[in-house]
């Protein structure tokens, strides 16, 4: 679910109006992170590291309201929950875009991810499905 933000009363209206004129109205950062402990936890849980870090990342995103805002057309919307999308490599060295519905239980999420990986690996093309709105 999502809700449209009333820009006329939103305290970030001025920021939105400024940044929405940019060709890419967002910023990204990268930083090295020591993932040793996360890797060890994933292995102890017998969950692939990819699933572990993706789950923890999306769980963190969903805890921060500002990370759940999206620009849709001329509107800002706030999603109740953000799901995951990742590129999945195939044997022939091509990849496809995936959609992985977030689940708070990491074992349930692991099942969702594995099902999606298997689907992508036998589905040709870059865009392998319709993405929910």
Where are these regions (language model features)?
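Structural preference for long, well-ordered alpha-helical segments in enzyme cores
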Residues: 54-60
């Amino acid at each position: 679910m999502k809700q449209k933000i009333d820009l006329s009363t939103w305290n970030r209206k001025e920021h939105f109006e400024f940044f929405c004129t940019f060709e890419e109205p967002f910023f990204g950062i990268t930083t090295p992170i020591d993932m040793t402990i996360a890797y060890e936890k994933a292995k102890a849980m017998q969950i692939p590291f990819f699933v572990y870090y993706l789950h923890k990342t999306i769980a963190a995103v969903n805890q921060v309201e500002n990370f759940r805002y999206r620009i849709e057309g001329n509107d800002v919307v706030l999603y109740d929950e953000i799901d995951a999308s990742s590129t999945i490599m195939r044997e022939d060295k091509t990849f496809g875009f995936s959609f992985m519905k977030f689940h708070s239980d990491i074992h349930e999420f692991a099942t969702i991810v594995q099902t999606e990986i298997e689907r992508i690996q036998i589905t040709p093309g870059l865009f392998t499905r319709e993405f929910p709105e």
